[in-house]
Amino acid sequence: MTTLTHRARRTEISKNSEKKMESEEDSNWEKSPDNEDSGDSKDIRLTLMEEVLLLGLKDKEGYTSFWNDCISSGLRGGILIELAMRGRIYLEPPTMRKKRLLDRKVLLKSDSPTGDVLLDETLKHIKATEPTETVQTWIELLTGETWNPFKLQYQLRNVRERIAKNLVEKGILTTEKQNFLLFDMTTHPVTNTTEKQRLVKKLQDSVLERWVNDPQRMDKRTLALLVLAHSSDVLENVFSSLTDDKYDVAMNRAKDLVELDPEVEGTKPSATEMIWAVLAAFNKS
């Protein structure tokens, strides 16, 4: 009986320890310098997906460019990075047969809810999937780009609209109906331009005034956002307000950053592997 009691206590301590780690990871995300704003936006916390969509939206029109066919997969990549940064998923450790980022499978670390519907829906898919899948495969599955009819169940639907509704609830966007000749479309114009400008300036500064020329020394969420903005084809929107000289510098530095070898960067001591795995997936696609 004593042994069983001790074993039960050890199990309880282990579970409590895991919950504490998850709580600390979520707390660290909330307290990240990247999530601390000034002025009116000090209480606003945005996910990477929300930031990418906000950067891609036309302020007054409230929709993304009709010619942008990259943002859907970019948002799915953002979901994977967000889950990894919150301690919910990770890449399996490298082995002799699986050294490359794109060969290694995405594993579940914790199925504890994040409070975000899209993140939690993805988490359920990852938990329920056997055998496990790679980062590139997950981006394809979540986007619905699969020829396997049995895997269409993993597609996340209405992602842009759901993210936009989150931004409406956070007071950054509003909802309107616009008529486009033959059909009506729901749009989400930006109402909190201060928050969007803060986001734009943060990215501009990261490749100009605060440029460190080393991704390992960059704030991880800023690095992730630069990678996702590039992969989602919205980086042009970020730098469009700069003078010609600064625009050229910013674009060249961002280009140098995303052209680094993900396999090399992902093995460095302080690297967040999921960021580089997502970049590698987009570079290959």
Curated annotation (Swiss-Prot):
Compositional bias per record (Basic and acidic residues), positions renumbered to this chain: 10-42
Stretches the record annotates as Disordered: 1-42
Membrane topology designation: Peripheral membrane protein
Keyword Phosphoprotein: yes
GO molecular function ontology, one term from the record: cargo adaptor activity
GO cellular component: cytosol; Golgi apparatus; Golgi cisterna; Golgi cisterna membrane; Golgi membrane; trans-Golgi network; trans-Golgi network membrane
SS bonds (residue pairs): none
GO biological-process terms attached to the record: Golgi organization; Golgi to plasma membrane protein transport; Golgi vesicle budding; positive regulation of protein secretion; protein targeting to Golgi apparatus; retrograde vesicle-mediated transport, Golgi to endoplasmic reticulum
Localization, UniProt: Golgi apparatus, Golgi stack membrane; Golgi apparatus, trans-Golgi network membrane
Keywords for the protein's UniProt record, in alphabetical order: Golgi apparatus, Lipid-binding, Membrane, Phosphoprotein
Residues that, per the record, bind a 1,2-diacyl-sn-glycero-3-phospho-(1D-myo-inositol 4-phosphate): 67, 76, 157, 160
Protein name: Golgi phosphoprotein 3-like
Organism encoding this protein: Homo sapiens
Organism placement in taxonomy: Eukaryota, Metazoa, Chordata, Craniata, Vertebrata
Chain's gene name: GOLPH3L
